[in-house]
Regions:
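Thiamine diphosphate
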Residues: 1-167, 171, 306-307, ...
């Protein structure tokens, strides 16, 4: 099977959906003339023209409001944020209009829109460009929240998101745009609201999403050298959460470790831990454990960045703790 970069998978998803449906269009900062800040939309202006690939001012609240209004009037916008850190300026439109309009209108007015862009840390970018936002948006009823970890899932889920009739928050990662993975040439869609088992195992379940899947899979490889077989699950869709797949894995392994790039309080791991202990308490042979980013803004110095984020060695250590192995 061919291998393409993450950015190419996203581009193909948008191109295919824009060819299929003339109501789909892309707008955001530098998406047209500059081919996108991360070159995700490269060549799309030439193919679709300036009415469907639209450069915007640096005014997130304003252009998000235009897109939300377009969605409420029958179009299907894709809004690219250069980073989700900047999208907080548009939160009024995402929270108070896009997520609520279907309920406020008694089901008469929908908002089929995709908000997408880079999320979380990407090295030494400082505190204001390094926040992971999955849990914040997942706390909003009316939104669907997707956070992808590889090109195959990115393409299949973005196509599904563009076709979805609800507003979808679609989170990527700046550090993954150049990474390559297998993506078939034929069309496919992936289901929103499903976890994906990326590695089967019997001893412990490790759950993660977005670029922390690298940590989860890397930890599983290290553990395998010691005879510990970890089952690794990519959540992929944060809301609606497919806790059932996680529960079925825990029924087999009896242990759960969650890895996420977010602050610990009121996080995605908090929700997963609550749901699994509620529905599967009798299957647990150890407390559910998690590894998150530090409960502080992310600093700039490389040693502090390394200390802030989850890593493979800390994850391996945590797995051994839930297996009651010697430290």
């Amino acid at each position: 099977m061919r291998q393409i970069a993450f950015r190419e998978a996203l581009r193909e998803a948008m191109q295919e959906e824009m060819r299929r449906d003339e109501k789909v269009f892309l707008m955001g900062e530098e998406v047209a003339e500059y081919d996108g800040a991360y070159k995700v939309s490269q060549g799309m202006l030439d193919e679709f023209g300036e009415k469907r690939v639209i450069d915007t001012p640096i005014a997130e609240l304003g252009f998000t409001a235009i897109a939300v209004g377009a969605a409420q009037n029958g179009l299907r916008p894709i809004v690219e944020f250069m980073t989700w850190n900047f999208a907080v300026l548009a939160l009024d439109q995402i929270l108070n209009t896009a997520s609520k309009m279907l309920a406020m209108s008694g089901g008469q007015i929908g908002c089929p829109i995709v908000f997408r862009g880079a999320n979380g840390s990407a090295g030494q970018l400082g505190a204001q460009h390094s926040t992971a936002f999955e849990s914040m948006y997942a706390n909003i009823p009316g939104l669907k929240v997707i956070s992808v970890s590889n090109p195959y899932d990115a393409k299949g889920l973005l196509k599904a998101a563009i076709r979805d009739d609800d507003p979808v928050v679609f989170m990527e990662s700046e550090v993954m745009y150049g990474e390559k993975g297998e993506v078939p040439e034929e069309e496919y869609l992936l289901p929103i609201g499903k976890c994906f088992i990326k590695r089967e195992g019997r001893d412990v379940t490790i759950v993660s999403f977005n670029k922390m899947m690298k940590v989860a899979l890397g930890a599983a490889e290290e553990l395998a050298k010691e005879g510990i077989e970890a089952e690794v699950i990519d959540v992929a869709t944060i809301r609606p959460l497919d806790w059932f797949t996680i529960l079925e894995s825990v029924k087999k392994t009896n242990r759960l470790v969650i890895v996420e790039e977010q602050w610990p309080f009121a996080s995605v791991s908090s929700e997963i831990a609550y749901r699994i202990q509620k529905e599967g308490f009798d299957y647990l042979d150890a407390p559910i454990r998690r590894i998150t980013s530090a409960d502080a803004p992310m600093h700039y110095a490389p040693n502090l960045v390394a200390a802030y984020l989850p890593n493979i060695s800390r994850t391996v250590k945590l797995v051994k703790e839930v297996m009651y192995m010697k430290k």
